[in-house]
From Swiss-Prot:
GO terms for biological process: fatty acid biosynthetic process; lipid A biosynthetic process. This is 3-hydroxyacyl-[acyl-carrier-protein] dehydratase FabZ. InterPro entries: FabA_FabZ, FabZ, HotDog_dom_sf. The active site is at 48. The keyword Zinc does not apply.
Length: 140
């Protein structure tokens, strides 16, 4: 398990763009499972949407990417480096995510060649799929 300080030692993201609160489990180069507690205090809800707050899908995708980056950047050969989005395929949004929800995100790495990684990501709320996607990472 990794807390926010340990996550910040791996990822370059900081408030307001560090979107995962805790890593529940991970195996370097294999998978990571993270949690994001969605709070009404997040600035995005001032405009998306007043009176009907909904977490934007791009924030869910970014939280997925950060989760996958933990699985990649904990490999010895990538420690201290940065993982960038290389692409998103087949993103599907299946459930609205609102303040008070807890996203559980799992990213399983399926391919890793040189500095390119591909992973399958799923985000759930209370066991219900909120988003699925295939993510490509580029390590710099």
């Amino acid at each position: 398990m990794l807390d926010s300080q340990e996550i910040q030692a791996i990822l370059p993201h900081r408030y307001p763009m560090l979107l995962i609160d805790r890593v529940l489990s991970f195996e370097p180069g294999e998978f990571a499972i993270a949690r994001k507690n969605v709070s009404i205090n997040e600035a995005v809800f001032q405009g998306h949407f007043p009176g009907n707050p909904v977490l934007p899908g791009v924030f869910i995708l970014e939280a997925m990417a950060q989760t996958g980056a933990v699985a990649l950047l904990t490999l010895d050969q990538f420690k201290g480096r940065t993982a960038f989005f290389g692409g998103v395929k087949s993103a599907k949004f299946r459930r609205v995510v609102r303040p008070g929800d807890t996203l559980e995100i799992k990213v399983t790495l399926e391919k890793l060649k040189d500095r390119i990684g591909v992973g399958k990501a799923i985000a759930t709320v209370d066991g219900e799929k909120a988003c699925t996607a295939e993510l490509t990472f580029i390590i710099e």
